[in-house]
Amino acid sequence: MVRSVAWAGFMVLLMIPWGSAAKLVCYFTNWAQYRQGEARFLPKDLDPSLCTHLIYAFAGMTNHQLSTTEWNDETLYQEFNGLKKMNPKLKTLLAIGGWNFGTQKFTDMVATANNRQTFVNSAIRFLRKYSFDGLDLDWEYPGSQGSPAVDKERFTTLVQDLANAFQQEAQTSGKERLLLSAAVPAGQTYVDAGYEVDKIAQNLDFVNLMAYDFHGSWEKVTGHNSPLYKRQEESGAAASLNVDAAVQQWLQKGTPASKLILGMPTYGRSFTLASSSDTRVGAPATGSGTPGPFTKEGGMLAYYEVCSWKGATKQRIQDQKVPYIFRDNQWVGFDDVESFKTKVSYLKQKGLGGAMVWALDLDDFAGFSCNQGRYPLIQTLRQELSLPYLPSGTPELEVPKPGQPSEPEHGPSPGQDTFCQGKADGLYPNPRERSSFYSCAAGRLFQQSCPTGLVFSNSCKCCTWN
């Protein structure tokens, strides 16, 4: 019997073995489930082979303890972490906080050693209970937005407490150590007020730099959401509102380049122009752009809403290496395939640890809008980072059980359905045929074939040249 699986095929069905150390960190948002029609996004829409790390946004905090935020989070956790059965190399993290979460609960939690210990203990229990591989701290921001100046040092202490506890728990439990990351701002004011960069970088596994939202409808003139460099005419504070300045700042303050993950947006920031005849960068604007048909948020448009604009004019900001479009009195600064390629080239030159994406649900994830296939922006990152790539659409075959018709021409012989009994989920060689392999998932046995000319290697759990 042929079994069709969403985003069929396992990550290991590759033309080359896994060897790149680059990370591709992708955020999943638990509110995208409420969008209408084709834009609704759930864990089933995720490609388990697309990103190296998936981060679930967001968890909350109750009485200094990690907690859910949506009515169905526990169900979504199960589906989200179940993706690791299809890609055993995938790592999943849970993010706590976010912009709308505010700062008060973080401030209260870090205020005393007892409160921090309560949080740390709850985090370990919560992550293990729901099968996450780590925690992502998204406090926006210590020392700002109502958070007192003392929270700068207290955030450092929190990071140290979590890192120490994660290490101790791994030694006690015998399990792989939980990962610890943080989403951090690009703006110098926020960084100076809230982060002892060299100290937290020692204890974080990686640092997700939110290199976007440099400009938006909160300003009175148009500007790009995520420019790579400054414009020639910019000086002073304005000259620091770009990706390059943010990266240099975090590196100079002590972040190892290999730990710094460059954030990239799959959305644009939109404006309503004061005059439809003045469409330049820096043109006067009266406020946020018109809400998109799916995201329904003024001043922000998903890539799948931007790419399908009819009658719009697209131009590139040569100094900043990014595009914008305009139509009538609407103006949007966004990223496209070309700008993502340029940014990956940049991060490689800087020796950074990889790319981060906000967010999965804002790319054209189903290929319904841009005529560029599924996940055109994130697939571009994957390819440019030289991560092994599995084309979607490869069918997964369930091994026939006794009495079932043997539709897969080269399926295992009847009786091998017991192969996975007592085995951990994962990939195993087919002793009868090197060009195929077995996969065990929740006690079920599946067989897949390598591409023509390749054989399965048990050492890398991948298809490679003979």
From Swiss-Prot:
<dbReference type="InterPro" id="IPR029070">
    <property type="entry name" value="Chitinase_insertion_sf"/>
</dbReference>
<dbReference type="GO" id="GO:1904724">
    <property type="term" value="C:tertiary granule lumen"/>
</dbReference>
<comment type="subunit">
    <text>Monomer.</text>
</comment>
<dbReference type="GO" id="GO:0005764">
    <property type="term" value="C:lysosome"/>
</dbReference>
<dbReference type="InterPro" id="IPR001579">
    <property type="entry name" value="Glyco_hydro_18_chit_AS"/>
</dbReference>
<keyword id="KW-0325">Glycoprotein</keyword>
<dbReference type="GO" id="GO:0006955">
    <property type="term" value="P:immune response"/>
</dbReference>
<dbReference type="InterPro" id="IPR050314">
    <property type="entry name" value="Glycosyl_Hydrlase_18"/>
</dbReference>
<dbReference type="GO" id="GO:0000272">
    <property type="term" value="P:polysaccharide catabolic process"/>
</dbReference>
<dbReference type="GO" id="GO:0006032">
    <property type="term" value="P:chitin catabolic process"/>
</dbReference>
<feature type="binding site">
    <location>
        <position position="358"/>
    </location>
    <ligand>
        <name>chitin</name>
    </ligand>
</feature>
<dbReference type="GO" id="GO:0035580">
    <property type="term" value="C:specific granule lumen"/>
</dbReference>
<feature type="disulfide bond">
    <location>
        <begin position="26"/>
        <end position="51"/>
    </location>
</feature>
<comment type="function">
    <text>Degrades chitin, chitotriose and chitobiose. May participate in the defense against nematodes and other pathogens. Isoform 3 has no enzymatic activity.</text>
</comment>
<keyword id="KW-0119">Carbohydrate metabolism</keyword>
<feature type="disulfide bond">
    <location>
        <begin position="307"/>
        <end position="370"/>
    </location>
</feature>
<keyword id="KW-0624">Polysaccharide degradation</keyword>
<dbReference type="InterPro" id="IPR036508">
    <property type="entry name" value="Chitin-bd_dom_sf"/>
</dbReference>
<dbReference type="InterPro" id="IPR001223">
    <property type="entry name" value="Glyco_hydro18_cat"/>
</dbReference>
<keyword id="KW-0732">Signal</keyword>
<dbReference type="InterPro" id="IPR011583">
    <property type="entry name" value="Chitinase_II/V-like_cat"/>
</dbReference>
<dbReference type="InterPro" id="IPR002557">
    <property type="entry name" value="Chitin-bd_dom"/>
</dbReference>
<keyword id="KW-0147">Chitin-binding</keyword>
<keyword id="KW-0458">Lysosome</keyword>
<dbReference type="GO" id="GO:0005615">
    <property type="term" value="C:extracellular space"/>
</dbReference>
<feature type="binding site">
    <location>
        <begin position="210"/>
        <end position="213"/>
    </location>
    <ligand>
        <name>chitin</name>
    </ligand>
</feature>
<feature type="glycosylation site" description="N-linked (GlcNAc...) asparagine; in variant S-102">
    <location>
        <position position="100"/>
    </location>
</feature>
<feature type="binding site">
    <location>
        <begin position="97"/>
        <end position="100"/>
    </location>
    <ligand>
        <name>chitin</name>
    </ligand>
</feature>
<dbReference type="Pfam" id="PF00704">
    <property type="entry name" value="Glyco_hydro_18"/>
</dbReference>
<dbReference type="GO" id="GO:0008843">
    <property type="term" value="F:endochitinase activity"/>
</dbReference>
<keyword id="KW-0378">Hydrolase</keyword>
<comment type="similarity">
    <text>Belongs to the glycosyl hydrolase 18 family. Chitinase class II subfamily.</text>
</comment>
<feature type="binding site">
    <location>
        <position position="141"/>
    </location>
    <ligand>
        <name>chitin</name>
    </ligand>
</feature>
<dbReference type="GO" id="GO:0008061">
    <property type="term" value="F:chitin binding"/>
</dbReference>
<dbReference type="Pfam" id="PF01607">
    <property type="entry name" value="CBM_14"/>
</dbReference>
<keyword id="KW-0326">Glycosidase</keyword>
<dbReference type="InterPro" id="IPR017853">
    <property type="entry name" value="Glycoside_hydrolase_SF"/>
</dbReference>
<dbReference type="GO" id="GO:0044245">
    <property type="term" value="P:polysaccharide digestion"/>
</dbReference>
<keyword id="KW-0146">Chitin degradation</keyword>
<feature type="binding site">
    <location>
        <begin position="70"/>
        <end position="71"/>
    </location>
    <ligand>
        <name>chitin</name>
    </ligand>
</feature>
<dbReference type="GO" id="GO:0009617">
    <property type="term" value="P:response to bacterium"/>
</dbReference>
<protein>
    <recommendedName>
        <fullName>Chitotriosidase-1</fullName>
        <ecNumber>3.2.1.14</ecNumber>
    </recommendedName>
</protein>
